[in-house]
């Protein structure tokens, strides 16, 4: 791994020379590409520097422990060493995930669609819990979070929730969240304390960039309907036709948005979701053969594939694709998703190395 890091650090030095040349500003496209690469390489360098510093601290503490006679100091040193070992393991996993060769689509914004599945109202409540989890995770990463569409259930959960997340490395870390998420817990409505199993499905759709010239949607292929927005229970909450339903006739993809009071805003949001769904379908079709091998390695991202189980009574979360089990579900639900997302990226990297891709 150190050899690979050295290669990237050499590349960082080259990039810094290039972006310091005033002539680079005359080529905005090249400057933009180099700036993105520089940010990525700098993040990798910072992660590696933290590892080197912590390794030195560990070495010094171990040396001190070998000659320490005071029992209290021995205990303190041992505790510090154990804590730093855990931290070093986390940092190494983060570095491994950063060593995954950058994909041009890594920084694409994503649209996440969460839907209640098996379990009725309890599944809808878990959608709400996951919405909060991803919101907190996005905030911790400095990403922008936006509600695109939401359909509440009777107990204030969500039958469906669609959100947009934008920022650096969004797709890179969130792409493996697609699939079926199973929850095992005692529902609030359960009077006998029995554990119920429910499930929700999540789709992660990369949002086409403005530079994406391949995705062209002809206005003639769209059927746009407007109607009055309605709230829970079917009551009307708007007396104007602000809700929008867009149908893409060639593919049959249908998107409805009614959360905004403005028809124009609802149409804009619906179009964003529509484009992301069409792009996703095209990419799946185009890369079907190439992704067959990869899907066997890290999960297909198919919404029918069970990827993760959240067991609340055991405070356990298990990702079935890589056999990762953590006993800190409480922290995960508070947005501490890095141990899972970085492990998935790292796993993908090792699979790419193993298969020579």
From Swiss-Prot:
Keywords: Cytoplasm, Methylation, Protein biosynthesis. GO terms for cellular component: cytoplasm. It comes from the Bacteria. InterPro entries: PCRF (IPR005139), Pep_chain_release_fac_I (IPR000352), Pep_chain_release_fac_I_sf (IPR045853), Prokaryotic/Mito_RF (IPR050057), RF-1 (IPR004373). Its main location: cytoplasm. Residues 285-305 are annotated as: Disordered. Belongs to the prokaryotic/mitochondrial release factor family. This is Peptide chain release factor 1.
